[in-house]
């Protein structure tokens, strides 16, 4: 790793299709645009796999079981690939907005999480921040509509509850 990259302040910006996420992106652009020394990791949380792709009923014949398991894995991979394709425009728009604010494209990384169990979304965000060595997480409040539908909660609130030793920007 080169010295300049080591000195970069890393920030994890959680994005989705929501207005809250768009506000978070604008907030980061406003505060960090045209400044040096920042690396922004865009993270898109893929929604949970549909129930029918979680498991199958099994089979008594081991060969049939193996075949069903392979078919399930193939269906899961296909669903994930489709979800990633659907998320690309969101990540592209976020990157475009940040570049327009003056942040160099070489300082922006786009990533996906694997399909996240709703109760684990906040943990996934914090784990990704730790893995990317991000000391700050930026998230829009009331983002991730799939999380709210399933849990009647808010990812940002859960991140706030779980976070330790990290800065949080929760954008309304």
What are these regions (language model features)?
Residues 157-172:
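Short, flexible loop segments at boundaries between secondary-structure elements
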Residues 6-8, 119-120, 136-161:
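Glycine-rich, Arg-bearing micro-motifs that act as flexible, cationic patches
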Residues 26, 126, 157-158:
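Active-site phosphate/pyrophosphate- and oxyanion-stabilizing loops and adjacent acidic/basic residues
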Residues 69-82, 108-110:
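Short glycine/proline- and acidic residue-enriched helix-loop micro-motifs
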